[in-house]
Regions:
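Structural signature of eukaryotic scaffold interfaces centered on beta-propeller domains
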Residues: 92-105, 173-181, 220-223
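Aromatic (tryptophan-biased) beta-strands that constitute blades/sheets of beta-rich domains
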Residues: 54, 71, 75-106, 111-113, ...
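Short beta-strand elements that form the blades of beta-propeller/WD-repeat-like
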Residues: 109-114, 134-137, 183-188, 226-231
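Short beta-strand segments enriched for Tyr within beta-sheet-rich domains
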Residues: 46, 50-58
Length: 248
């Protein structure tokens, strides 16, 4: 969610998501640059299918006037949404992890979960009668979410806008998530590699160079700003013919 700035300059921003009873608090500061990027206050960590209470404080600047503001918002966040495959073991959309024990040292942690749903009629459009496949052989839908140490989902990725099960170039298993130094995430799937921030803002979404196919598992950021991708060669020269190579 974004709490819009209404055209005012706002600084010294602090956000707190009021936790559920016995829940985990999420609180953070927002830089002036991020406030400009989003046109307001980015709100992260809302409980899904729940009316959240969000407390914000900031300095409102209008000319020479500076005003310290504290506000509280009630924001409903929609339910978690992942692909429904028809599999017998899929009974709901939530991840429902069972928390066994939380060490006090780790109780404020958040965990990014990257899970794959098995292929189904919807998520396996390019694997009919072909036992070899490539990255698309494992083309089930993705379950990407961030959970807290109480087992609650605090963020999830709706993949529909970027993942098209009916397109060879826009489907495949989402793998290789890595948080970069700027906070944004890089990952890849099928014939693509991407970078988005946690609020869903696209930084880039690119097709693999045409000499390569079938991204899987690893997209690593280098110190110099380049990226290493695990892919296959689109055409490897053999004695009498060319053939796609295995990944690596």
């Amino acid at each position: 969610a974004i709490i819009r700035d209404a055209g005012f300059t706002i600084q010294n921003i602090h956000v707190r998501i009021v936790p559920k009873s016995n829940g985990q608090e999420i609180a953070y500061k927002v830089t002036n640059q991020k406030a400009k990027t989003y046109g307001g206050i980015p709100v992260f960590g809302l409980y899904p299918d729940y009316v959240n209470t969000v407390e914000v404080s900031y300095t409102k600047v209008a000319g020479d006037k500076r005003e310290e503001i504290k506000e509280s918002y009630r924001i409903y966040a929609p339910p978690v949404y992942f692909y429904a495959t028809g599999a017998r073991d899929q009974k709901n959309m939530d991840m429902n992890p069972e928390v066994k024990k939380v060490d006090p040292e780790f109780k404020d942690r958040l965990y990014f979960i990257n899970n794959q749903i098995l292929n189904s009629w919807k998520t396996g459009q390019f694997t009919w009668n072909n036992p070899q496949g490539g990255a698309l052989e494992w083309g089930g839908g993705a379950q990407n979410a961030i959970i807290d140490t109480t087992g609650e989902v605090r963020w999830f990725m709706n993949t529909d806008p970027i993942h098209d099960q009916y397109s060879v170039l826009e489907s495949g298993p989402m793998l290789g998530f890595e948080q970069n130094k700027d906070g944004a995430y890089t990952w890849g799937f099928g014939q693509r590699y991407l970078k988005y921030d946690i609020m869903g803002r696209k930084i880039w979404n690119r097709r693999l160079p045409q000499s390569y196919i079938d991204f899987s598992h690893a997209l690593c950021a280098a110190e110099n700003g380049n990226y290493f991708l695990r892919v296959a060669a689109a055409a490897y020269a053999c004695l009498l013919y060319t053939s796609p190579s295995p990944r690596d």
